């Protein structure tokens, strides 16, 4: 049989593009899906085939593709100006966006530093927290605490506080070393969940009691450790972490890059436990999935420590060329307007309830270890033998098989190893959510129970 001719875009992709988190040897052996446009919760390829955007284009899309309000905001702004620097000038969209973010954020987060993506937002928080300690005379406070299985980005500072060895171990010699907590979401058996919760908090108490006067901040994802496979933290963990860090004057840096903007059912995941952190980072959904933008929110206490004369050298010397980009800020403002006008958060409880109900039959599938869910975020972990917890071998590529089979039925989902991920746009209807879950369930059943299926696939990691 003659080899199928790739489209021009696919040919150029294979010749010139290096994809993120992708083993390119495997990629170059495949015929890629070329997405030309989007409509609502659907992606549409160059042949006109429609796919549910089951992972919100890597957890960023909120209101669906081609939303008229967001489109119009970009058109209106481009007629004014695309970008002007925030170094020495004011940009109206960025000023208004910072105001609105503060109004939405947990109490006490009064200042906003804009950047470009989740990694930069955390990098800003790490540097601000460290510089603060130096400037107020707490020079011994140089250490950070991070969680095992945490993920905060790909820059060297964020990799330092990351806890996924597969991604980070090659850079070990370039990194600063944090104090590490066991994740409350990592356990061999669901029955061990409470034990994991208690052990993580006990270790935090020990670290703080022994080294608290040397620690700048604790960095964590609230409620869900996303890149580790949607590991859901037990209720009460975040609140207790906040209490302990406050007792020892350790900053809490909360990474809401994936969980922010209603993904968990509330506007910010912190709200579930009434927590106000010292730093909160936002990105992904901030522009509704339209453009790169990020924000690091912090307190007046932190901000005031950077005020002084030039000679005092208290300035925060950090920033990017496109910080506060007018187009990105304009569409972010439009996204917040859609949240208000379309009462997005009011519609979520019914959607989450339907999503939860639709997922219930998947729990009883032969090779499903656990279904982890928070709001419209779900991770379905697969095992070769659930009774003995025997894992699939990496080359079984069971998650990749599920993704390919789901794609054949019109759903784009990207697994993390053997964890099948769904994080659909908030704009999805109940019927669309139920259909996505149906496709995933059928694909899991086929991938795990049919012999000899798609044997040449390799694992997909994030």
What do the predicted segments below correspond to?
Residues 2-462:
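Conserved N-terminal phosphate-binding loop of PLP-dependent enzymes in the Aspartate aminotransferase
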């Amino acid at each position: 049989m003659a080899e199928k001719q790739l489209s021009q875009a696919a040919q150029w992709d294979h010749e010139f593009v290096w994809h993120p988190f992708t083993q390119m040897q495997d990629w170059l052996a495949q015929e890629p899906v070329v997405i030309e446009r989007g409509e609502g919760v659907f992606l549409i390829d160059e042949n006109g085939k429609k796919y549910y955007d089951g992972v919100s284009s890597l957890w960023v899309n909120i209101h669906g593709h081609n939303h008229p309000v967001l489109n119009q905001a970009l058109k209106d702004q481009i007629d004014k100006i695309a970008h002007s620097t925030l170094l020495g000038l004011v940009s109206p969209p960025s000023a208004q966006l910072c105001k609105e973010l503060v109004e939405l954020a947990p109490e006490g987060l009064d200042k906003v530093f804009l950047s470009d993506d989740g990694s930069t937002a955390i990098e800003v928080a790490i540097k601000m927290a460290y510089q603060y300690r130096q400037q107020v005379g707490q020079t011994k406070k140089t250490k950070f605490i991070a969680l095992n299985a945490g993920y905060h980005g790909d820059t060297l500072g964020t990799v330092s506080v990351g806890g996924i060895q597969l991604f980070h171990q090659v850079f070990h010699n370039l990194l600063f070393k944090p104090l590490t907590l066991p994740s409350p979401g990592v356990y061999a058996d669901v029955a061990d969940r409470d034990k994991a919760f208690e052990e993580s908090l006990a270790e935090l108490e020990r670290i703080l009691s022994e080294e608290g006067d040397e620690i700048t901040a604790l960095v964590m994802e609230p409620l869900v450790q996303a890149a580790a496979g949607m590991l859901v933290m037990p209720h009460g963990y975040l609140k207790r972490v906040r209490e302990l860090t406050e007792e020892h004057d350790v900053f809490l840096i909360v990474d809401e890059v994936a969980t922010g903007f209603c993904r968990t059912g509330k506007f910010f995941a912190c709200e579930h436990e009434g927590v106000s952190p010292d730093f909160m980072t936002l990105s992904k959904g901030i522009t509704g999935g339209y453009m790169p933008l990020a924000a690091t929110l912090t307190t007046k206490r932190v901000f005031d420590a950077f005020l002084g004369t030039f000679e005092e050298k208290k300035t925060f010397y950090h920033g990017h060329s496109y910080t506060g980009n007018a187009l990105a800020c304009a569409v972010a403002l439009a996204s917040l307007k859609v949240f208000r006008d379309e009462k997005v958060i009011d519609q979520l409880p019914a959607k989450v309830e339907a999503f939860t109900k639709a997922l219930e039959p998947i729990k009883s599938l032969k090779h499903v270890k656990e279904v982890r869910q928070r709001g419209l975020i779900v991770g379905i972990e697969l095992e070769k033998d659930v009774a003995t917890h025997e894992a699939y071998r990496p080359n079984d590529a069971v998650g990749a098989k599920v993704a390919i089979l789901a794609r054949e039925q019109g759903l784009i989902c990207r697994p993390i190893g053997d964890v099948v991920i769904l994080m659909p746009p908030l704009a999805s209807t109940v019927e669309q959510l139920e259909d996505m879950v149906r496709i995933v369930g059928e694909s899991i059943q086929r991938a795990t129970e049919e012999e000899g299926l798609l044997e040449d696939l390799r694992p997909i990691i994030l």
